[in-house]
């Protein structure tokens, strides 16, 4: 498997990118990585490690697209940027997938415009995997499409179901529609119309509306929504988890000695919970519906996060998720 890596994407690039790639190569020796970015900077970082030289290839790219640039304009203007060169490697079928922790807007726009959509897919969607009490769940769309149509959400449900089925070995993943109430008549025009379409779609295991308070249980495998609501729910969930853990720490500091000793006994359990909510463990979010394996890593990813993003890309590839999505949409054309 060959993976294109945006060597200058993210707050900690290129050091964290190179660290993650070298670390992953120790575990996945069959892989080959193409890191895009200024050759001198990437070479300097690589010189710190011992690795098989034929397994990491540098693709020189002089420019970088920052997060404050207009995504589409930057993609058109900066043809020699690390992200554009990485995307072209996938477009030209030189690489099987791409990972970037750079500008989300530029990455998503680039995946759509350069790599291209799968035939039949109206809008690609971002689908991060999150930890739930009784299992992982996917939120799709989590921010790629702020404005959506009911038909788009049905497609998001299909792509999310295919991903979840093949990656987590769940034969019939459940799909819930993010809404303000469980009843069918609740919500706005978008959710009401989407509910009707999902209920009629035989290829989806639609279980009805799901309120945000029930998302963390993990009982529903795929939470489908427009990008605005999905991104809001995702960030609220991430923020709540961090704040609850922070509140526990604050209370421990104020507690008496006896209580602190009790907390020490719980430390292994608390560590496991904290690990579940650490974005580094998940690597990144798949961008579903484009004609390639595209993984968006967190902007502040470190070496560990990049390594796990590589692992996630490998799982996507080995489980033929891309081909399965293509097959589903070929039926409709």
Swiss-Prot record:
**One Pfam family, short name please?**
FA_synthesis
- Keywords in UniProt for this one? Cytoplasm, Lipid biosynthesis, Lipid metabolism, Phospholipid biosynthesis, Phospholipid metabolism, Transferase
Top EC class for this record = transferase
Give, as in the UniProt entry, the pathway in which the protein acts: Lipid metabolism; phospholipid metabolism
A single Gene Ontology CC term? cytoplasm
Q: What is its EC number?
A: 2.3.1.274
Instruction: State the Gene Ontology terms under molecular function.
Output: phosphate:acyl-[acyl carrier protein] acyltransferase activity
Question: What InterPro entries does the entry give?
Answer: FA_synthesis (IPR003664), Phospholipid_synth_PlsX-like (IPR012281)
Q: Which domain of life is it from?
A: Bacteria
Similarity section: Belongs to the PlsX family.
What is the recorded function of this protein according to its Swiss-Prot or TrEMBL entry?
A: Catalyzes the reversible formation of acyl-phosphate (acyl-PO(4)) from acyl-[acyl-carrier-protein] (acyl-ACP). This enzyme utilizes acyl-ACP as fatty acyl donor, but not acyl-CoA.
Q: How does it assemble?
A: Homodimer. Probably interacts with PlsY.
Know the name of this protein? Phosphate acyltransferase
